[in-house]
Each structure stands twice: as structure tokens, then as C-alpha cells.
Amino acid sequence: MLKKFFLTAIIFCMLTGIAQAADKPQKKSVWQPELRIGILSGVTQVGLKVSAPCIMIDAVTKKTLKKIPAEKNFAVDFAQMKTTAVEIRPEKIPLKDLIATIDGRKYFGGVRVNKVKGSLTVINLVPTEEYLRGVVGEEMSPAYPLEALKAQAVAARSFALKNRERHDKEGFDLCPTTHCQVYEGFEDFEIVNKAVDETRGEVLTFKEKIADTNFHADSGGMTEAVADVWGTNVAYLVPVKELLELTAPWTMKFSAKDFSSRFGDNFGDVKSIKLSTLTIGKSANDRTSSGRVKSAQLVGTKKTLTISGIDLRRKFSLPSTLFDMKLSGDEVIFTGYGRGHGVGMSQQGAKTFAEKNWTYDKILSHYYSGTKLKKLY
């Protein structure tokens, strides 16, 4: 009888324990992709400091080379480095909680230093979510509405993971400039952190693959087809209209002499410019479907040139290719709208939509047609 009582009690305790375990909230996934951001290159020495005790590892053999104390300045010197690459990682805390100072600037995460052709390349080893804390507030103003910042967080996360080996030949994933995404390392904007945290692990996908979510400052009224900028057709990067048109107006003037000199002696002096008038969303032989300049004809005293809008933008450092241009007396005048290449999400447009109470997922679906929002981790 006593045995039966104990057996019953044991079974009851086991079942109760299982039930209680099932009732406990499951711990959120802490895993996230680690990114390699190229910070410095072509240097022979780099000054470093870490916020917590770390170990320096031979990146090839994985052997511990030495321990690094917290908050003590130290340097990695090319001449004294006996291996091709070292990594500095936290001894006890998660990588995301470490702050590394590289040449005076703070970054989330650890550090890798590679020997490359007589100099050092310095790389920030940073978890994706911490990387975004240093990107979102640089690519978009922290003064923008939360839903716009959340859209930016998803776009930046998707772009980073889609293009994470863009600089693989140089030994890292992404650079910290507009070539990839502007990254300033450690930043602590409350609203940016909220935007990142509330979209943790979310990316845009198209046909089960992460989308290449290009974005820009201001479309001027309508975004551009990626095929008209980089020559590749992408189903979700097509022109879409904004709530507002003719935004971010700009004017740039050049003397006719200066203008002509940019095309070489064989061009002579500019006599006339042939380009149809800009209308947002109206295509022409010399304009794309959004109204951006596809090409313009420049008539010189010695030669007539046909030049693309992209080349004109590059040659004269124009804010965008959404412009009119004319020869007026001894001046060439560009009058345009928008800032940036025009592909994908307009950051100013996202702000305007958010101010009209659009949620971040609705903003993203507007700019990236046919994509799906997916929680990757």
C-alpha cells in the first residue's frame, strides 16, 4: 500500500512538473548572424580597447594567444604580428554585449585584424541586430516616425544579409559607407533601438529568397525601375508613386565654359541642349517611365554628344537624374527633384506614409512590390 502511495506521488509530481514547464514562456532565440564590417585598411598599426575581458585568438589555428584586460589601451602592430589574422572576442559575455574601441571610435562586438599585402585590415565582428543600431539612425533621421524607422530597420537588415559577402575578396562582408550602408558603430538612440527590437530578425523575401532592398533619400515623387539604373530586371524594384510629387527641389548652375570643358576639347563650346520636359511618371524617348533622364543630346561647336542621365549626374555631382536642363545665355541650368538613385524605398516617402498612419509592413509592401515579410530568426 505504501509503495503504491509513493508511486502515485512520484507520477503526480512528474506530471505537475511537465505541466508547469509547458506553462513557462519559451525563451526567445538569441542566435543571430554575425557580420564582418571593414573599418580600416592600409594601416600598419591600430589602437584598441575593449569593455570586458577578452581573448586574442589566432584566426587560423583558433589557439588563444593572450588575454586582453578590460578598459586598457593596447595596439596591434603589423611588424609584431606573427600570424596572418587575429580575432579579439569576449571571454565570458556574449559578443553583442561587448563594446570595442577602434582608433577612438566605439563599436558593438569584437575585432578581427588581417595582414594584407604589407598592411592591416581592421574588421568589426558584430551581430546583425547590433550592427543595425549603428546603421538605422545614420541612414534615416531618428526624428522620423517609429513606423518609418521600423521599415528602415527591415530594409537595412535585408540588404545586409542579402549582400553580406559583397567585399569577401577583401576579407569582410560590408563596408561602412554608402557603397553598402552607412555604419557609425556604437549608437544609442532609444527610438532606433525600439525599431530594431520590434522587427528583430525580420527580412523581406521574394520567392523564398532574401530581397535586395535598395533604398534612397527622396524619390522626388516616383521611384525608379532598377533596370534603368543598374541594367538588371528585378520584379520587386519597379516604379511606384509617392503621396507627394516634386519633393526635394534643387537647382545647379554652371557657366557654359565650365560645362563644355567637362566634355573635352573635341566637344568645343555648347550650342544647344536637347531634352524633353520633365513630367513625373511620364516616359519619353529620352526619359524613363518615372520621368528621369535616360539620355540628353548636347550639341557643341565641334561635336554632338548623346550622354546618359546617370553619366550627367556623375559628371556634375547632381543630386538625382530627375531633372530638366537648359542653356540660358552663358549658363547651363539644371533644375530637379529628389536625392539619390531612386530605386526601392524612399526614406522621405516612408516618413510621409508613416505620418499618414501607415504601418511599417504596409510601407515596405508599397516600395517592394510582391515581397513578403518573414521572421528569419
Language model features with spans:
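Conserved, single-site charged/polar hotspot
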Residues: L2-Y377
